[in-house]
Amino acid sequence: PPPPPPPPPPPPPPPRAPPPPPPPPPPPPRARIADLRQQARRRLPRLLLDNAERGTPEGPGWRANRRALAGLVLKPGPAGAPTGARTGAPTGATPDPATRLLGEEAAMPVAIAPTALAGLFHPRGEILGARAAQRVGIPFCLSALSVQPVEQVAAAVPRPLWFQLPLLRDREAMRALLARASAAGCATLVVTLSARLPVPLPRRFGQGGGLPLGLSLSQALDILAHPGWALGLLRAEHRSLGNLRGLVPEGDGLASLLPWLQAQCLTAPDWQAVAWLRGLWPGRLVLKGVLRPAEAHAALDCGAEGVIVSNHGSDAGAEPLPSLQALPEVARLLRGRCAVLADGGIRSGGDVLKALSLGACGVLVGRAWLYGLAADGEAGVERALRILHAELCAAMRRGGISGMSGGGQET
């Protein structure tokens, strides 16, 4: 008989189920200004960052401002919106924080605050900050105590700069600085009514263009541990105060300029000097350091178009009045007569909205842009400003605010 047929092959095993897709990666943590601060601390010698933060721990004015911001809770919904802000945004709509500051269009009610010696945080620091502000669409205020001279910074951006000038005892020096700012096309003059320089800098920065001399061993080792920063400073075109070159007979190095400035800067308002500056300056005049009603009235009498409520320059030995605590009364007194801005401790878009809710038409940020500058140059400054813009939009969305145009005390 024929052999039996072979047994049928076993059925194929059932197809294996495809492996489950890997879980999506966790979303990146939300960027904050505090993250840029940590990056800046890794890149900068502690000496430099501590001077920017007015010592360690951070100075009493900063602490007072931060406490005031932390203690302010916005009312939910449109009840907490700034005066004049547009409310009733549709669900999911993107708010528009664009506004006008001192007659200029601004993508948000924020300007970069004047910061002395920003060019020590990154080569060409003021130019990089001005370019980032230009791209984001907000004003940039250049300090008279900048490393890059006003002519170079103004030439780097098409938008006119704001120029900040401390009140000096030497009026001819102020006249010379005003002439340079006007020739460079600056449209707004910000006069700081009282100024106080960081005390350690004159002791720790020597001659030869501002390189640190006379440091302790730990400070010298700290600088050596940050070679990228040190090499950038050595290669920089400017390492002193570019706007003060030629003003001081003793020389143009920081070792000569900073002691001269400490003797020159007024620590209390001189309203006669302010009126004299008003007569010289053809553009807009803004007074920085207004905290009290009498100062607000004096600002109007001097013909100022704007004030900045700020405790900058407060006595480091006393607890200063927080800017946001002084803001509501100043805003009420000047409503419709003068633009009111504020600064002090602004670290988030929520902080911006809090200041607006108290009557400001805008705020100035100082340390926030310095952290970005130290962390990643021009891109870091832009990142800091984009963070503030995104956080402000989120805060507006939570409050049902659709836009800022016409809000605050802008005139």
Model-derived regions, located:
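Alpha/beta catalytic cores of nucleotide-metabolism and tRNA/nucleoside-modifying enzymes
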Residues: P25-A70, P322-A342, R347-T411
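Short, basic, glycine/proline-bearing loop/turn elements
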Residues: A111-L117, P160-P166, A255-L261
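An N-cap/entry alpha-helix motif that binds or orients negatively charged groups
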Residues: P25-G103, G209-P269, G406-G407
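Glycine- and other small-residue-rich loops at beta-strand/loop junctions that grip anionic moieties
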Residues: R54, A118-H122, L142-S143, P166, ...
